[in-house]
């Protein structure tokens, strides 16, 4: 009898030991990914979704071996700073910061936790990194920088006689400041000029747009987060003033822009997700060069064009990756 009891105890002990080891292994394999964005709008949401897709495809399952958390700053930089401090306190394996303001907030609070930015136009101008070739620090990421000559080419295909381009932007957003400077230089090469109006908050977008109405031949929007968050207001200004609105991010075409040639933001997120996996598997963020969007797409909206007083050419519509109807 005692032999049987001793044997049972040994079996039970072995079973418990196996359970503890299995639990420890699961815990050790669990990775924590914290994601933040300055605001929620279609382009930034697509980045977030792309990150999540890639992690799932790689076998990182939320609730099993992945701790996933997402927080939006709802357009408030003070909230972005609070989220950054909270995430740093959580000590995740990786923080993914979507947009320049979110990335700046996170990097102001940690020099050790790996940080991956996405939907950032010029990370050097935004002082996130000193080099596109590898920061040597705790940051890397994926830029949505576009070749502005191709953006101007698109503008002129849609409005051939355009001379003055209008841009509404947030002067506190480094991305937008960089685009404004580059766009001014690109337009000057072609004998064109840029007029701008400031929208420090999303609620200022409509007023800023109306201040340009009648003075510009085309409205052009970059991925300024205040403008994109209030894109329907910008589209209404374009419609009311009969001024074509051309975007740099394809998701804005379904919200009222007549066309956009830009990066695929879901793919931009997938690129960031693949970088996150590399880091979680042991690579250092500072050794990974900054990437740019790998996939471009042209979206057009003939209905929006008609409402804004123009007709898109059949040739352009045929070239489009997606036609919004």
What does each model-found stretch correspond to?
Residues 2-16, 27-325:
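Short hydrophobic alpha-helices and adjacent helix-cap/hinge residues
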Residues 23-25:
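N-terminal signal peptide c-region/cleavage motif recognized by signal peptidases
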């Amino acid at each position: 009898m005692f032999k049987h009891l001793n044997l049972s105890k040994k079996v039970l002990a072995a079973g418990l030991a196996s359970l503890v080891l299995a639990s420890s292994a699961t815990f050790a394999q669990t990775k924590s990914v914290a994601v933040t964005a300055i605001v929620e709008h279609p382009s930034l949401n697509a980045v977030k979704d792309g990150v999540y897709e890639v992690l799932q495809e790689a076998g990182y399952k939320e609730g099993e071996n992945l701790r996933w958390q997402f927080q939006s700053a709802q357009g408030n930089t003070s909230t972005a700073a609070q989220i950054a401090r909270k995430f740093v306190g959580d000590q995740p394996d990786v923080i993914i910061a979507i947009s320049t303001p979110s990335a700046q907030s996170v990097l102001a609070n940690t020099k050790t936790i790996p940080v991956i930015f996405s939907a950032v136009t010029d990370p050097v101008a935004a002082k996130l990194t000193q080099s596109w070739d590898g920061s040597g620090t705790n940051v890397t990421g994926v830029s949505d920088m576009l070749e502005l000559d191709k953006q101007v080419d698109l503008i002129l295909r849609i409005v051939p006689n355009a001379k003055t381009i209008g841009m509404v932007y947030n002067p506190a957003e480094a991305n937008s400041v960089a685009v404004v400077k580059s766009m001014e230089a690109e337009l000057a090469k072609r004998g064109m000029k840029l007029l701008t109006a400031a929208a420090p908050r999303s609620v200022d977008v409509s007023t800023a747009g109306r201040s340009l109405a009648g003075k510009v031949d085309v409205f052009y929007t970059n991925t300024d987060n205040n403008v994109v968050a209030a894109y329907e207001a910008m589209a209404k200004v374009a419609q009311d003033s009969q001024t074509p609105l051309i975007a740099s991010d394809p998701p804005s075409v379904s919200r009222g822009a007549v066309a956009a040639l830009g990066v695929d933001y879901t793919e931009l997120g997938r690129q960031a997700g693949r970088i996150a996996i590399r880091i979680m598997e042991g690579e250092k963020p500072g050794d990974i060069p900054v990437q740019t969007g790998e996939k471009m797409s042209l979206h057009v909206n003939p209905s929006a064009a008609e409402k804004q007083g123009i007709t898109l050419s059949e040739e352009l519509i045929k070239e489009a990756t997606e036609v919004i109807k």
